[in-house]
Amino acid sequence: MATYETQGFKLNDSGRRIIVDPVTRIEGHMRCEVNLDANNVIRNAVSTGTMWRGLEVILKRADPADAWAFVERICRVCTGCHALASVRAVEDALGIKIPKNAHLIREMMAKTLQVHDHVVHFYHLHALDWVDVVSALNADPKRTSALQQTVSPAHPLSSPGYFRDVQIRLKKFVESGQLGPFMNGYWGNPAYKLPPEANLMAVTHYLEALDLQKEWVKIHTIFGGKNPHPNYLVGGMPCVDSNLDGSGAAGAPLNMERLNFVRARIEEAIEFVKNVYLPDVLAIGTIYKDAGWLYGGGLSALNVMDYGTYPRVNYDPTTDQLPGGAILNGNWDEIFPVDPRDPEQVQEFVAHSWYKYADETKGLHPWDGVTEPNFVLGPKAVGTPTDIKQLDEDAKYSWIKVAALAGHAMEVGPLVALHPRIRARAEDPKSYRAHYLREQVENSARAINTGIPQALGLKQTDYTVKQLLPTTIGRTLARALEAQYCGNMMLDDWHEMMANIKAGDLTTANVDKWEPSAWPKEAKGVGHVAAPRGACGHWIRIKDGKIENYQCVVPTTWNGSPRDSKGQIGAFEASLMNTPMAKPEEPVEILRTVHSFDPCLACSTHVIRPDGQERVVVKVR
């Protein structure tokens, strides 16, 4: 590779190589290799998806109405989002419009996933990159209680005795030597910056979130029959409004008792995000900011995009409550419109991916996409195909294709909607709750700069939003803010559906085009959703009533992209650049930033290779 510059980053692979394989606490299988300079600063990063995508091949010649049930199995963590993208793609192709109740039910299910996924991601997948669990044993429960009441006075579980009980439980757990989910942590690493009391508070909330998350997904069970993998339907939703005046007789698919249960779970989630999740992220972010840890921005200040979602009025994108658009080349003053139908915008490339195109210098729009595997190691790779010691990033090195927007490597995810110019688009009068995004960001910046530092005796700062957001901390904060926003929107959806039902509209599906005989001979469509990890799109071509071609371009396809033919690096790789490491043999910093994207390799590449390793190997070369 030698040394070269791209997207404002200077890459140099001459330093020693650190290999993390697999990256754990994600969905799927991922490998990461970085090169360090003499000061242990990352100067080159190589992100690899080590699973192969095969679902598009499986779907060929299948019934389009069944596609959602196949693609939903891509991942059980971001469950439902692929099904929703799929039914939207088919409906778009066939010209099907869904009823209002179906739209509102889909909205509530999608937002339930956002809240649930962000909470589970932070506490159970990502928090351990910020929180030293063993350090919590040294905490003073009284001081922990005081900290809790400072950062979140409204949370009722905050007494010294409560934290002491959790600490005793944790102590027994640690002393048993069977740490379970806390096994193999790099406890004591100097990259951890929280005081013991903050660690105890976070571990306590880890346990609280574990209890609550299983209740929230019952919303999916009520509307979709089960979780994971709730049921969807081309043309609407399979649930039926009946017995709405009853108390919930056995066998009633949807009734007032169950609808009131949904409202209770929504309100419960709103309170937890407001009083626990968001305060924890703000407190942790403030302490790490105080330690100078504002790394991990990568492409987030340069190139970001989203399609836009959550329309207040279905089929009217001007009412999107999370607006779409793109920022390119770091120009925060201009929004580039994103059109998933434009063959010159969304394209996939395979120059450095283990796939084959007729002309690998060119990208393909998903409607014309090809998924043909071509697993070959580059000439500078070390090892064998079943025991790779080191990859050759000058050649093919990932099962993830390169997703690009108008030729640009992009970052997607919750951070996108918080960029000032994109956020400003939500302030259109048609976009309900639009002002809320601006208030969220401004209040969070004040809390991190002055509010929490003043309460904790830390140095106050005056970082701008443009300095705080494009960081690992900012990316983590964005998930919490999106969870808060989605919870509030979900309650609006519930009230709107109840009003619609009371007005006499009980329709949940449009089956006018259920029979293939009502379809055109050929059709194509696209469906997109805001998955917890960002922009998720499904493209379909239908011919003679069967799927002719199907392509998914999912969030981790964007963020996990390898290099393209021009040498541009993807969002994962860019985010690791210039990050200092305290102890390279314990890569906390790599995990912290990669986890901030909530990678889902199961989504971006769909079939695990049979020789996939099962234990974490960290190699320093």
Curated annotation (Swiss-Prot):
Keywords (A to Z) from UniProt = Cell membrane, Membrane, Metal-binding, Nickel, Oxidoreductase
EC assignment: the record states: 1.12.99.6
Q: Which domain of life is it from?
A: Bacteria
Q: Give coiled-coil spans as residue ranges.
A: none
Q: Which GO terms describe its molecular function?
A: ferredoxin hydrogenase activity; hydrogenase (acceptor) activity; nickel cation binding
Tell me where the signal peptide lies.
none
Subcellular localization: Cell membrane
Q: Which cofactor does it need?
A: Ni(2+)
Q: Please provide one cellular component term from the Gene Ontology annotations of this protein.
A: plasma membrane
Q: Which PROSITE patterns match?
A: NI_HGENASE_L_1 (PS00507), NI_HGENASE_L_2 (PS00508)
Top enzyme category? oxidoreductase
Reaction(s) catalyzed by this protein? H2 + A = AH2
Topology versus the membrane: Peripheral membrane protein
* Cofactor binding: number and manner: Binds 1 nickel ion per subunit.
Annotated Ni(2+) binding sites = 75, 78, 600, 603
List the InterPro entries.
Ni-dep_hyd_lsu, Ni-dep_hyd_lsu_Ni_BS, NiFe-Hase_large, NiFe/NiFeSe_hydrgnase_LSU
Record family assignment: Belongs to the [NiFe]/[NiFeSe] hydrogenase large subunit family.
The protein's role, per its UniProt record:
This enzyme recycles the H(2) produced by nitrogenase to increase the production of ATP and to protect nitrogenase against inhibition or damage by O(2) under carbon- or phosphate-limited conditions.
Q: How does this chain assemble?
A: Heterodimer of a large and a small subunit.
PANTHER family, per the entry = HYDROGENASE-2 LARGE CHAIN, UPTAKE HYDROGENASE LARGE SUBUNIT
Record-given protein name = Uptake hydrogenase large subunit
